[in-house]
């Protein structure tokens, strides 16, 4: 029984992409650099020529707004968010994120990728 449980947990974990691996692949495709350290000691997930991008799973969309704006200020670039939509998401977090951005006219560009 323990072997079956361990086997199940192992394959569940390898089936889920990590935020870091998604960021590395996506950021590279955009011509950006990952984990850029700011003068504040914080790390931008993906820094491109024009954008400082926070990469976050959909359920953490609220936190991504503040981080994206902070990274933009720290780098002098525009703010961006890469929202990772999880396969098991039952809530439209992208809709919620866009509602806040639009209501307050926040200068954030949103990108979406699937898990």
Feature annotation, model-predicted:
Residues 58-113:
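Catalytic cores of nucleic-acid endonucleases
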Residues 46-57, 71:
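Conserved catalytic cores of phosphodiester-cleaving nucleases, focusing on short active-site segments
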Residues 40, 113-115:
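Residues that form or immediately flank small-molecule/cofactor binding pockets and catalytic motifs
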Residues 31-33, 56-59:
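Short, flexible loop segments at the rims of nucleotide/cofactor-binding pockets, characterized by
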Residues 1, 39-42, 68-72:
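Short hydrophobic/aromatic-rich motifs at helix boundaries and adjacent loops
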Residues 13-49:
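Acidic-basic catalytic patches of nuclease active cores, encompassing PD-(D/E)XK
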Residues 30-33, 48-51, 74-78, 106:
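Short glycine/proline-enriched coil/turn segments at helix->beta-strand junctions
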Residues 3-13:
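Sec-dependent N-terminal signal peptides
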């Amino acid at each position: 029984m323990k072997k079956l449980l361990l086997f199940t947990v192992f394959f569940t974990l390898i089936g889920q992409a990590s935020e870091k691996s998604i960021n590395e692949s996506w950021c590279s495709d955009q011509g950006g650099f990952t984990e850029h350290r700011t003068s504040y000691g914080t790390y931008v997930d993906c820094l491109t020529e024009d954008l400082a991008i926070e990469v976050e799973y959909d359920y953490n969309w609220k936190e991504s707004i503040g981080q994206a704006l902070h990274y933009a200020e720290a780098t002098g670039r525009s703010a961006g968010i890469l929202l990772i939509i999880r396969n098991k998401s039952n809530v439209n977090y992208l809709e919620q994120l866009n509602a806040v951005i639009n209501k307050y006219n926040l200068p954030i560009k949103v990108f979406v990728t699937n898990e």
